[in-house]
A protein has these predicted regions:
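Conserved catalytic-core segment of nucleotide-activated headgroup transferases in glycan assembly
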Residues: 1-31
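A structural signal for well-ordered alpha-helical scaffolds and beta->alpha junctions
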Residues: 3-7, 96, 128, 132
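Short amphipathic alpha-helical segments and helix-helix/interface helices
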Residues: 7-15, 35, 57-58, 132-136
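Donor nucleotide-activated moiety binding/catalytic core segment of transferases
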Residues: 21-73
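Catalytic binding pocket for nucleotide-activated donors in carbohydrate/polymer assembly enzymes
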Residues: 49, 55-125
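Hydrophobic "lid"/C-terminal helical patch
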Residues: 103, 107, 134-139
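Non-catalytic membrane-proximal stalk/linker segments that position and tether the catalytic domains
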Residues: 119-138
C-alpha cells in the first residue's frame, strides 16, 4: 500500500517547480491503457511495498521509463529491483525534496538517466526468454 501522505507531499513539491508535470495513477486501466501510459512516460514512481519482483516496475523499465522506488520490501535489494541505490528512498518528510529533485532531473534530462535501467531491462528480457525455455524443458518439448 502506498504512503498517500508522502505521495501528496511529492506532488505538492513538484507542482511548485514545474506545473506541466502530470501524475497518472496506474489503476483501473486495461492492459492497453497501462502500456500506452508507460510508453508515453519518462518516469515511473512506486512508493508501495514490494513483496517480491513486481510486475509494474518491470513493465515500466521495459518501456524505457526511468524508475524511482521506495525501499520497502524487495525494492530495497538490488536483485529484485536492480536500479541505482540513489533511486530508492525511505519515505520520510526529509526525503521529499531529494525525491522531487531526482524526479525533475529524470524528466528534464531523460536521456541522461534512461541507461540506468539497462541492467534491469536486460534482466526482464532474459527472464522472458528463459521462461519459454524452462517450460520447454519441463514438458520435454523439442
Amino acid at each position: 500500500k502506498i504512503d498517500q501522505k508522502f505521495l501528496y507531499n511529492i506532488k505538492k513539491y513538484i507542482s511548485t517547480k514545474n506545473k506541466d508535470i502530470k501524475f497518472i495513477p496506474i489503476q483501473n486501466m486495461s492492459r492497453k491503457q497501462v502500456f500506452d501510459t508507460l510508453r508515453g512516460a519518462k518516469l515511473y514512481i512506486d512508493f508501495g511495498t514490494f513483496p517480491g519482483p513486481e510486475r509494474m516496475p518491470r513493465e515500466a523499465v521495459s518501456l524505457y521509463c526511468n524508475i524511482i522506488t521506495s525501499k520497502k520490501g524487495s525494492a530495497a535489494n538490488n536483485v529484485d529491483v536492480p536500479i541505482p541505490r540513489e533511486n530508492k528512498f525511505d519515505l520520510t518528510d526529509e526525503n521529499v525534496p531529494k525525491v522531487g529533485q531526482l524526479m525533475l532531473q529524470m524528466i528534464e534530462n531523460y536521456e541522461d538517466y534512461v541507461s540506468q535501467g539497462d541492467q534491469y531491462r536486460e534482466k526482464v528480457y532474459d527472464q522472458i526468454e528463459s521462461f519459454d525455455q524452462r517450460i520447454a524443458n519441463i514438458f520435454d518439448i523439442k
